[in-house]
Amino acid sequence: MLQRIMRKLFIILFLFVCLSANAVEKKTNFSEEIFENAKASGKTIVVNSYEVWCGTCSKQTKILDQAEKEFKDIVFLSYEQSKNKNIAQKLGIKFWTTIVVYKGNDEVARVVGQTDKEIIYAAIQNGI
């Protein structure tokens, strides 16, 4: 009996560790003011919608963090979908694995659920 309880506790602990390892560590940095100013300036903007528990989002975040270091003139903004539904509604983003690229006022690329670095980078380069 005790062995069975210990096994269940171990499984629960293991699942918790696995989920925590995939958690997105990024915080919302989307600001309406920054977004609108970047659009008005004709800058390239990358908007990322995520959830902290989402494994796909975690992979996307790692790729976008790397891209942010490589593309210095691009504005990278992110927000947690469930906590910022107003942003999602304004930008027409329905899913939390969505990356949208703007060039000024124009949306130039949108990818959903993508974790392939080359495809994400190609979307970003559409805004350059």
Segments from the language model and where they lie:
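Non-catalytic, surface beta->alpha helical segment in thiol-disulfide oxidoreductase systems
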Residues: 103-128
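Positively charged n-region of N-terminal signal peptides that target proteins for export
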Residues: 1-9
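N-terminal leader/targeting and pre-domain segments
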Residues: 15, 23-41, 126-128
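Thiol-based oxidoreductase modules, predominantly thioredoxin-like and allied folds used
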Residues: 49, 68, 72-85
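Structural micro-motif
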Residues: 91-100
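Short active-site neighborhood of thiol/selenol oxidoreductases, capturing the structured segment around
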Residues: 40-52
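Typically the conserved alpha-helix immediately C-terminal to a functionally engaged Cys/Sec
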Residues: 56-70
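Sec-dependent N-terminal signal peptides
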Residues: 9-18
